[in-house]
């Protein structure tokens, strides 16, 4: 009897520990240090830079939850598309700046931004957000600045992950972009499970778009398993792409990565 009780107690401890670890919110990048980068800006003064960015987010960058707070990244940030979706905190010490950090997401590529080892080509809205009240245009008129930056957790409260199916997708070729991911913001692996099938790994394109060409027609509904790039956390968007799906459509899931505590 004592042996059975001990085994039961041990099982409960292991199970409790498992859930404590599994359900713990993402605390990614809290311990990263501030480094130096260069910034410029492009597009309209209060705009998103462009809605045709290389990452493939389209006009979503101008809407909730991104609200134009995005940036093109130089080669060290864009990382041949693997940097798409990553979030960064920036702060500026110029007299026109508030010195309070802002947060931006990488949504585009700036291949010519190589003057510094790390360079953000910000949207006009994001560049101006660094400024003191009423000083946005004066700051933008400077054109170029040095800032401090560090990697940050993406945080989109009350927003679930969405799957934006590519306009060229068909039963033999599935491709889509994942939007609104909390935490790391980008992915180490994305897998698709068609109806009655097994999970299949997708190929990351040079953007936030992932694709799969299985050689046979795929039928929905589809489960999507997402593995976060840095933390390695996994979530499954069950049935997020329905049986009767359409190319170009956006499908909203019921899941997202846990939102972390406030960063310093």
UniProtKB/Swiss-Prot annotation:
Lineage of producing organism: Eukaryota, Viridiplantae, Streptophyta, Embryophyta, Tracheophyta
Listed name of the protein: Expansin-B5
Keywords assigned: Cell wall, Cell wall biogenesis/degradation, Disulfide bond, Glycoprotein, Membrane, Secreted, Signal
Bilayer topology annotation: Peripheral membrane protein
Listed GO biological process terms: anatomical structure morphogenesis; plant-type cell wall loosening; sexual reproduction
Organism of provenance: Arabidopsis thaliana (Mouse-ear cress)
Cellular component GO terms, alphabetical: extracellular region; membrane
Induction: Possibly induced by cytokinins.
Domain Expansin-like EG45, first and last residues per copy: 52-159
Family that this chain belongs to: Belongs to the expansin family. Expansin B subfamily.
Keyword Coiled coil: no
The keyword Cell wall biogenesis/degradation belongs to this UniProt entry's keyword annotation: yes
PROSITE patterns: EXPANSIN_CBD, EXPANSIN_EG45
Pfam families linked: DPBB_1, Expansin_C
């Amino acid at each position: 009897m004592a042996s059975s009780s001990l085994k039961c107690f041990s099982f409960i401890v292991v199970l409790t520990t498992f859930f404590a670890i599994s359900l713990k919110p993402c605390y990614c990048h809290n311990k990263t240090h501030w480094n130096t980068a260069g910034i410029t800006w492009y597009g309209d003064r209060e705009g998103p830079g462009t809605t045709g960015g290389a990452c493939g987010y389209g006009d979503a960058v101008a809407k909730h939850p991104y609200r134009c707070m995005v940036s093109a990244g130089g080669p060290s940030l864009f990382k041949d598309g693997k940097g798409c979706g990553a979030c960064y905190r920036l702060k500026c010490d110029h007299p026109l700046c508030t010195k309070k950090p802002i947060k931006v997401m990488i949504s585009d590529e700036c291949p010519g931004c190589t003057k510094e080892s790390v360079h953000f080509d910000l949207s006009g809205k994001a560049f101006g957000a660094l400024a003191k009240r009423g000083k946005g245009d004066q700051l933008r008129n400077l054109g170029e600045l040095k800032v401090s930056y560090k990697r940050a957790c993406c945080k989109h409260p009350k927003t679930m992950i969405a799957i934006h199916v590519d306009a060229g997708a068909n039963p033999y070729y599935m491709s889509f972009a994942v939007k609104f991911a909390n935490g790391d913001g980008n992915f180490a692996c994305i897998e698709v499970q068609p109806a009655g099938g097994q999970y299949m790994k997708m190929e990351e394109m040079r953007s936030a778009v992932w694709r799969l060409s299985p050689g046979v027609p795929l039928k929905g509904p589809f489960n999507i398993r997402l593995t976060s790039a840095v933390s390695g956390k996994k979530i499954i968007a069950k049935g997020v792409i329905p049986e009767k799906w359409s190319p170009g459509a956006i499908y909203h899931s019921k899941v997202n990565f846990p939102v972390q505590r406030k960063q310093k």
